[in-house]
Amino acid sequence: MFNWIKTFMLMAAITALFIVIGGMIGGRSGMMLALLFALGMNFFSYWFSDKMVLRMYNAQEVSETTAPQFYRMVQELAGRAGLPMPRVYLIDEAQPNAFATGRNPEHAAVAATTGILNILSERELRGVMAHELAHVQHRDILISTLSATMAGAISALANFAVFFGGRDEEGRPVNPIAGIAVAILAPLAASLIQMAISRAREFEADRGGAVISGDPQALASALDKIHRFAAGIPFAAAEAHPATAQMMIMNPLHGGGLANLFSTHPATEERIARLMHMAQTGTYPA
């Protein structure tokens, strides 16, 4: 229950940020329009964001006929987790990665890149897909998709404020420097909110995935491999839609410094250490 309250507050913060930017562009009228737009975005995201994200990544749905081994693996893990069978997708990308999306367990989808299938053993791949199913089980998928959609909209609105300016309550033009500051700080604030939503949920999905697969060491090994391989392979679709990066099992974006500081994912080393502790002791560190 606490996680749901925290998530609601964080989503409210994203919506409030959206309204503030609307106010900078069009005063009180801009705030009202931004509020209506934010509510519309949340409604649209609830029903359609999974389809939108899968289309962004050109994900292709597979079946037991077209990808029998992979499909049956997901089917077996979903059964172990007590979940309905999700739709299964493959993305033709060299970078090893995977994500889950959908509004609830009854309307969920899991996707993996061809790159992850190429580098992981069957045991490691089971660990990764169990991690994604843990997101479904914990109902993280709606929150991550909603926050990704809203964060992307905030960035677009902030850029609009720079290029087209805005007006205050008296109709006077907003200082262009303020507009530039909004364009820089608003996406950063949205990223911080996404980070707060995502990091704790990744640890929980690691723990939950290890329980579903019964093999925390395999997931730890998979994370190590993905981390090493992903660092040297660009992911064009993720770079084009950076707000969706927090949905992935591993941050798909390249960059250092601030990019790492504000990463939506916990440090891979810490994730591995926690899983190895679980493998050795049977308990996941708090």
Curated annotation (Swiss-Prot):
GO terms for cellular component: plasma membrane. PROSITE patterns: ZINC_PROTEASE. InterPro entries: HtpX_protease, Pept_M48_protease_HtpX, Peptidase_M48. Pfam families: Peptidase_M48 (PF01435). One of its GO terms (molecular function) is metalloendopeptidase activity. It is an enzyme of class 3 (hydrolase). The keyword Membrane applies. Binds 1 zinc ion per subunit. GO terms for biological process: proteolysis. Its EC number is 3.4.24.-. Its cofactor is Zn(2+). Keywords: Cell inner membrane, Cell membrane, Hydrolase, Membrane, Metal-binding, Metalloprotease, Protease, Transmembrane, Transmembrane helix, Zinc. It is found in: Cell inner membrane. It is a multi-pass membrane protein. The active site is at E132. Signal peptide: none annotated. Its main location: membrane. Zn(2+) binds at H131, H135, E202. The chain crosses the membrane at residues 7-27, 29-49, 146-166, 177-197. The keyword Transmembrane helix applies. Belongs to the peptidase M48B family. This is Protease HtpX homolog. It comes from Ralstonia nicotianae (strain ATCC BAA-1114 / GMI1000) (Ralstonia solanacearum). The lineage of its organism: Bacteria, Pseudomonadati, Pseudomonadota, Betaproteobacteria, Burkholderiales. The gene is htpX.
